[in-house]
Structures are given as C-alpha cells and as structure tokens.
Amino acid sequence: MLLIAGSRPEAARLAPVASAMKALGRVDPVTVAGGADPMRVHDAFEALGTAPGVTVLPGVSRVNTVRVAAALAVRFDDLLAERKPAAVLVAGGGVAALIAAQVAFFHKVPVVHLHAGADVDDLLCPFPEEGNRRVIAQLTSLFLHTAGRGVLCNVAGPNSITVGDTLDGLAPAGPALADLATRARRGSARAGILDASVSSILSAGSSLLGSTPDLELVLVGRSSTDVWADPVLVGLTGHPRVHLLERDDVRDLLGIAAVSSFAATDRVDRYFESMACGVPAILVDSGRGGRGETPYDGEDLLDREWIPAVAPNAGAVLCAMSRLLGDPSAGAGPAGSRPYRAGAARRVEHAVAWMLGLERDPAPNSEDPAKACP
C-alpha cells in the first residue's frame, strides 16, 4: 500500500500509520514523499522514524502549482504502474493528495482518504485545499475522519469511519518539549508556537505569559547564538515557561504542534503548515513579504487578501492571541478542553485491513486489546 504525503503535516499524519502497519504485519506500507518540495517531506518522514520508500521529484519549478501537479501526475502514474499497490492512502487536501487520488482512480486502485479538515460550505476556503478535498471525495473508496460529530470508532456512514487524529500520537524528541506535550495532553498546560524573528510577536508573547499562568511558549526560527541580538528575546529565553527551538527541528516542531493552542508568524508557509496541523494560527503583516523559504501547495494561486493578517504591533498581536486562547471553537479553549485520544494510527490500520478483506468489522472492538479503542 502506498502512503503518499506532499507536505510535512501530511507526513506527520501518515508516519504513525506506516509504523502501525509494520508492527501488525498484515499491510505492507510504502511511504512516498512528494509535493512541491519532496525533500522537505522526505526529511520529515526520516525525522519521524519512517524513512520514505520512494521520493518523487517533480523536476519542475516548485512555485508553479499547475506544473508541479502535471509533473506529479506523470511520476505517480509510473509509480503505480511499477508497484501495483492494493490501495493508496492520502491525507489532507494538498495538490499531491489530489493528483495521487486521481492517478490511483485511473489505475482502478482504491483510494483511502485521511480527512483532517472540517466540513465547510465555501469552496474557496481554505484555498485550494477545500476544492481539492471535494475532488478527492468523489474518488475515495474509504473515508477516515480525524474528527467529527460521530464517536471514535463508530462507522459514520457507508465506508466512512471516524478514527481520531494520528498526529496526536506524535511526541517531541527533546525531553523538555516532550514533558510539555505530556502536560498539555493532561490539561495542566497550554502551548503556543511563536516566530522568534518578529518583535511584535515576541512582545505580545511576553505579555501573554504574565497573564496566563498555564501557558508555555515555544520560540521557533532563531538559533541560541542569535538571542543576544534581540533584547525582547533575551528576556523571554530566560523565562522558565519559554522553550527555544533552533531553526526547524522537524520532530520537535511537529510534535509540539500536535498539542499547541495557537501559533503566530509572519511567514505564509509557516502559517499554513500550522493550520494543516490543526493549530489556530495568526499571520502578522510584518512588511517583510511573508513568503517564507518553502512554498506550500497552491501558494502561487492564492489571493493573499483572503488571509486575515494582523497589524504588526504588539497590541494587535496580543489581542489576536488572547482571542484564540479564549475561544474553544478555535481549538485552544481552557486547559484540557482539546481532546486527545491514543490509538488513531491503529484504527486506521484496522479500517484499511477491513477494506482489503483482512478484518470482519470496519472498527476494532474491545475484545482485541492491541487494536481496540481506548
């Protein structure tokens, strides 16, 4: 079975599934790194302990989504013709997921979709993911929902199962962040991810720490040698509830994103990566362009006026952060309000095994402790 990811959040959701499949030994997973920047996805799979079996290089400019999609279609076609998989598993609504689903359909290979978004009525929100998801839905044989109105492990409809978010089982590698993730899951702490290169974000974070005793901040994007160049950063890094994450340590960043209440950045790529991880995010209009180092799927097609940017002053950023922390519908809410459930990856494996005729029921039951719902 091919597990195809086109972004780091997609890799983070599929890596635990690959591990569960290998552990149970009845479905042979082959992880595939694709998308506009496949090496970034490749590195994410490796950092998460699941080295990709295949890395698909588009061979075209990664800033043109249409050309990337066309190149991926040819390469995925060759891959499926060579591998002849029993099924293809995709996550989210990126361009790689869209093309993988279409090519699998052309090859008459069942598509399994791990759907991590909310059901919305606006085709253009988020863009282009929502449109991509609707196309994928028409080609999908088995829907696996990370969240929904149904109860975990209950079949929500024909070939539709709520399994939980596989990202929630991911833990940071660093001991301090791993401890923070554990406390966040227990409801005794909340975490926020801040771009350490934006002074208004740092100032707002400093104020928020003083008024929110259960909040801890993870600063991303600056090395320890850069700290002394920014007085606000100097003060924050000495705070007992502040953690400095140098550059982009993938395992730590995705692991802490799995439990974070909000994120704030001035980079479009980090903004959308946070949103794809289910983290409510704030995009600050710092005037630096905000493009970031890595394009996300569809960036060249996006009307940037659609993104609700926050003014680059500490007061506006603080107001936006406080709003997310106090809004349960945004996913932050009071400590302990965000649900975390173990075993999602094994529920995905079980559902796939059922689709392939290896299980009688689509969801595990309490008689099988290795695969049962908690």
Model regions: which residues?
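Glycosyltransferase specificity loop/lid
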Residues: 1-83
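A donor-sugar binding/catalytic signature common to diverse glycosyltransferases
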Residues: 89-91, 113-114, 143, 249-296
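C-terminal amphipathic helix plus adjacent low-complexity
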Residues: 167, 174-179, 318-319, 326-374
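Catalytic binding pocket for nucleotide-activated donors in carbohydrate/polymer assembly enzymes
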Residues: 272, 276-327
